[in-house]
Amino acid sequence: MRRLYDSYAGVLAGICARYITDADDQKDVLQESLIQIYTHISSFTYQGRGSLQAWMARITINQALMFLRAQASTTMMGEVESIADDTTDEPDVAGLSEGEILDMIRRLPVGYRTVFNLYAIEGKSHKEIATALGIKPDTSASQYKRARTMLAQMIKDYKRQI
């Protein structure tokens, strides 16, 4: 089990950080994920290279989503500053490090960040996201669009500062 932890804890911690901003909460979700992984490792079926990491990532994502749903302050349609509903061109991320981009994603409101991670990074459809989060597919699409708009503005602001 120690070898499993040493090999994958960093990757799983990164997944937690994409969904949850508070470091202590990230650690809690990582710990819960590892408990679930250790408890259910006997149900894992090897399906080729990368299947173990994918299986553990899915457990970690599910734990992060359960944590977010349990938060009383988590509302997918929470109070957020108004955003112009314009069509945003792809933001120019040239010159930005992966860490800078991830930091900007972490600064999104929780609902936007969750939908953005599931759609843009995990490759889920808006229908799958809606089912997982208990929202409508149109709400997922709207939140994704707003997340992209906010990220584009963050990138523009950041580039003006450098």
Question: Where do the language-model regions lie?
Answer:
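Internal acidic/polar
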Residues: 66, 73-98
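Structural recognition of an alpha-helix C-terminal capping motif at a helix-to-coil junction
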Residues: 14, 28-35, 50-62
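A short, charge-rich alpha-helical start-of-domain segment used by transcription regulators
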Residues: 1-14, 103
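Arg/Lys-rich amphipathic alpha helix in sigma70-family domain 2
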Residues: 43, 47, 57-78
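A short pre-motif secondary-structure segment
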Residues: 115-116
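DNA-recognition helix of helix-turn-helix
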Residues: 65, 121, 127, 131-161
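Sigma70-family region 2
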Residues: 18-21, 34-49, 70-72
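Short amphipathic alpha-helical boundary/capping segments
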Residues: 100-109
